[in-house]
Swiss-Prot record:
Superkingdom of this protein's organism: Bacteria
Assembly with partners or alone: Monomer.
Protein task: Peptidase. Has bacteriolytic activity.
Cell compartment(s), UniProt: Secreted
Influence of pH: Optimum pH is 7.5.
This protein's GO CC annotations: extracellular region
Temperature dependency: Optimum temperature is 80 degrees Celsius.
Name this protein carries in UniProt: Proteinase L5
Signal sequence bounds: none
Length: 12
């Protein structure tokens, strides 16, 4: 899980 540009998203 990473936070970038105020958006949290999951990465493999």
């Amino acid at each position: 899980a990473t936070v970038q540009g105020g958006i949290x998203y999951r990465m493999p």
